[in-house]
Every structure is written in structure tokens, then in C-alpha cells.
Amino acid sequence: MLVVLLTAALLALSSAQNTDEEVSNAEISDVKQQPDSDSDLPSDDVNPGNVQDHESAPAANEEPSVSPGNEQEEQQQQPLPVENQEPSDKERHRKQKRPPPETLHHRENLRPQIYRQFGIRPFGSLFPEPYRFQPWA
């Protein structure tokens, strides 16, 4: 029951973050498209009330509807990697591969040594050892 509630809360949180990102992307695209929309106005003697309505209307219209055109615009807004530009630290970290281990089971090889230090048989009953009599114990 608790797992279901936590999963539902996590999904709600992630969807809220996604909608916030979409709204911010829509606002950014409105700001970038604003000079083009000013050229579409019929005349320069527009009163300030009409300009405010013109700016607020696209933000309200773009939030509920998502069309393929908007996705293409968002993809075009993303910066394209420049050939001469150095990759960022995250990209370098992604591209780096771990060096191959010295042996195939390099971590497993350490376990029997640790087990023997504490008197634990690593393989259980596969390799039974005779009980050693210790007269001082």
C-alpha cells in the first residue's frame, strides 16, 4: 500500500515538473518570437491594452495543446554542438569507459581472503575442512 502511494506521488511530481518545463519552454519561445509578431501588427498606433492582450494570449493557448510544430521549434532552439568546442565535463564522463579489470573476478578474488581472516569458510560445505582441535580454547 505504501509503495503504491509513494509511486503515485513520484509520478505526480515528475509530471508536474514536466509541465513546468513545457510552460517555461513556451514562454521562452514566445519571447524569441515576439519581434516577428510585432511585424505582423497592422500599425504602430496600437494602444497598450491591445499589446498586453497580444502577449498574454499565446502563453495561455500553448500550454494545453502540444503540436509537432512546437516540438520542432524546441529542438531548433537547443544549441548545436560546435566542432571546435571542447566537450563539457558531463560529456567527457559519459564517453570515458572503465578500464578493464586485471582479472575477470577481481572483486570475488578478495572475498576468500577476507573470509579466512574472520574464520568464515567462503564456500560453505563445498570444501569441508576438518575441525582442528585447539587445546587452549
From Swiss-Prot:
Compositionally biased spans, kind Low complexity: 75-85
Keyword field: Secreted, Signal
Endpoints of the signal sequence: 1-18
Residue stretches of biased makeup (Basic and acidic residues): 99-110
Segments for region (Disordered): 14-113
Subcellular location as annotated: Secreted
GO annotation, cellular component aspect: extracellular region
InterPro entries named in the record: Pro-rich (IPR026086)
Keyword Secreted part of the UniProt annotation: yes
SMART domains with a match to the protein in the record: Pro-rich (SM01412)
Keyword Secreted: yes
Domain of life assignment: Eukaryota
Function: Unknown, male-specific function.
Name the UniProt record assigns to this protein: SMR2 protein
